[in-house]
Amino acid sequence: MGNQLDRITHLNYSELPTGDPSGIEKDELRVGVAYFFSDEEEDLDERGQPDKFGVKAPPGCAPCPESPSRHHHHHHHHHLLHQLVLNETQFSAFRGQECIFSKVSGGPQGADLSVYAVTALPALCEPGDLLELLWLQPAPEPPAPAPHWAVYVGGGQIIHLCQGEIRQDSLYEAGAANVGRVVNSWYRYRPLVAELVVQNACGHLGLKSEEICWTNSESFAAWCRFGKREFKAGGEVPAGTQPPQQQYYLKVHLADNKVHTARFHSLEDLIREKRRIDASGRLRVLQELADLVDDKE
């Protein structure tokens, strides 16, 4: 598509809600601990992004034409996007003292939290990329759903866990999300090569609820890219039997450099709580959405 896009994220913080929106407190998921970590993270050079790979469509996948280079959009000026102001909670996650996830802006290893119109994403993506799709709406509206994760397989197509089924859909039509971003670097695990990521996704097409061992779209998409059993439901030892260095800690970064930390016995539980916070209205658009989405050309 070759669009030159403004980066469209400004971040404000708001206080973390103290209760579950349903009114049911899940104590086992919200065990606060007086456990804080140094701001210095481990050297992550072994977790860098892989080289680019040409990806062929495995059996069962629709053809995935090669996507335009993710840098191609720098060479053209077309449909500049209005800047959005997001009120978005930032997270980091640890297993013991090892950082395994970071959605925190700033610093040398800060996450890129820029969001783009869904119609612009194919120009920024390559097969095997992880996408986070967002439903942004004006501040007075009810909270949007939790962010939806998917694997990009080329040709404007994604594979994702949606409504209890693993399916392949057009990126432009998936859930009518209006913006998204590439989130390959948020999890700090070593990624599989792009061809294997696409094969993992395609190999599970058509599975339905009773056959699926992931509890949400993020866990499925992340498993496709990293291949770690911890993303599967029940993929870890029973709760309460791990030593502290094997337990998980979610840090929620609040205003004034405050951090709320909670402990979990599995990555599955940590992801569930992180997504609950995301779905509780922390993601808001504070200005007009006019001209948000490019023409679908």
Swiss-Prot record:
InterPro entries: LRAT_dom, LRATD1_LRATD2. It is found in: Cytoplasm. One of its GO terms (biological process) is cell motility. Its main location: cytoplasm. Residues 138-233 form the LRAT domain. Pfam families: LRAT (PF04970). The modification Phosphoserine is found at S38. GO terms for cellular component: cytoplasm. May play a role in cell morphology and motility. Belongs to the LRATD family. This is Protein LRATD1.
